[in-house]
Amino acid sequence: MLQQLDLIQHEIEQYHPTTLQELEEFRIKFLSKKGTITQLFTEFGQLSPADKQALGSKLNALKQIAQEKYKIYASQLQSTPKQNTDVNEDYTLPPPADKLGSRHPISILKDRILEIFEKIGFSIVEGPEIEDDWHNFGALNFSPNHPARDMLDTFFISQCPDILLRTHTSSVQIRVAESQAPPIRAISIGRVYRNETISARSHCMFHQVDAFYVNKNVSFVELKQVLLYFLRSLFGEDIKMRIRPSYFPFTEPSVEIDINCRICNGNGCNICKHSGWLEIMGAGMIDPNVLKNCHIDPTTYTGYAFGMGLERIAMLMYQINDLRLFTENDVRFLKQFKAYA
């Protein structure tokens, strides 16, 4: 073993790394957990007491020589300015392109929905997120004691009890109908707020789509065809739609719209609770009282309206199982949508 130590010491002394990569190779070869010196210490433990006494100091000195050499060259190489050693580098080439971010999935879906409805004549409208009680509740036929008016469901402004954060974009429908004469065909997409616990399935802030059409002789058949056109444009021609009766204060009759589950293709899974269907939006014919509140004669004009949560649509389209991902700004999540932009 003494001869082996002499050979390794000679090899260490002759080693003169010129780059950090060569220095790392030196460390791995001699000082790493599987390096030569570590293996020598393992073999040293199996020697007789007499051999240990003769070789112990020599082995420790060898390790110290290697460590000192590594330390000296590490200091020298790390302080030396990095030089360009690539003689084949072409300085006439353009620089690498900047790494661009991706659009948010909600923005992608919002633009897609607006594009679909613009093709059939819907105008894009907007309204305030801080709303008054009349436009958010009263004009939409909510009774004074309706549960939605409770502080447990709605964010009210403490200094002004009549002012609140809108709970739906239907308030935009009222503002547009007050300021325009029929025929009116409009769609609005924006943030809404509800006093709900933040979880994988609910949030205190989300986006809602609201669209309506008012004209003479508007029928439920038109509503059905518009919704079928929208769902086929968004999800594909193979989409199936189911209409169920429901209740909303601002429409009569009111319906819920279901589509066949995109996860299990209608066969039944945990997402659709093994029914094969997923609720996707609410719709109906505008209640005559709502038209009156907007100074529109319900004996002359009729209309339909429908609304849906944008995040819910996005979760179905992109198979996302946690609503909170939309607001956490996790780059790992967002960069997956470059292909959809």
Swiss-Prot record:
Pfam families per record: Phe_tRNA-synt_N, tRNA-synt_2d
Binding positions for Mg(2+) per the UniProt entry: E252
Subunit structure, as described in the record: Tetramer of two alpha and two beta subunits.
NCBIfam families listed in its UniProt record: pheS (TIGR00468)
GO MF terms, alphabetically ordered: ATP binding; magnesium ion binding; phenylalanine-tRNA ligase activity; tRNA binding
Classification via PROSITE patterns: AA_TRNA_LIGASE_II
Key words, A-Z: Aminoacyl-tRNA synthetase, ATP-binding, Cytoplasm, Ligase, Magnesium, Metal-binding, Nucleotide-binding, Protein biosynthesis
Database matches in InterPro entries: aa-tRNA-synth_II, aa-tRNA-synth_II/BPL/LPL, Phe-tRNA-synth_IIc_asu, Phe-tRNA_ligase_II_N, Phe_tRNA_ligase_alpha1_bac, Phenylalanyl-tRNA_Synthase, tRNA-bd_arm
Record carries keyword Protein biosynthesis: yes
Catalytic activity: tRNA(Phe) + L-phenylalanine + ATP = L-phenylalanyl-tRNA(Phe) + AMP + diphosphate + H(+)
Enzyme class, broadest EC rank: ligase
Compartmental location: Cytoplasm
Cofactor notes: Binds 2 magnesium ions per tetramer.
Family of this protein: Belongs to the class-II aminoacyl-tRNA synthetase family. Phe-tRNA synthetase alpha subunit type 1 subfamily.
PANTHER family on file: PHENYLALANINE--TRNA LIGASE, MITOCHONDRIAL, PHENYLALANYL-TRNA SYNTHETASE
UniProt organism field: Amoebophilus asiaticus (strain 5a2)
Reported cofactor(s): Mg(2+)
S-adenosyl-L-methionine in keyword set: no
Signal sequence segment: none
Record EC number: 6.1.1.20
Main location: cytoplasm
GO terms under cellular component: cytoplasm
GO BP of this protein: phenylalanyl-tRNA aminoacylation
Protein name: Phenylalanine--tRNA ligase alpha subunit
Domain of life from the UniProt record: Bacteria
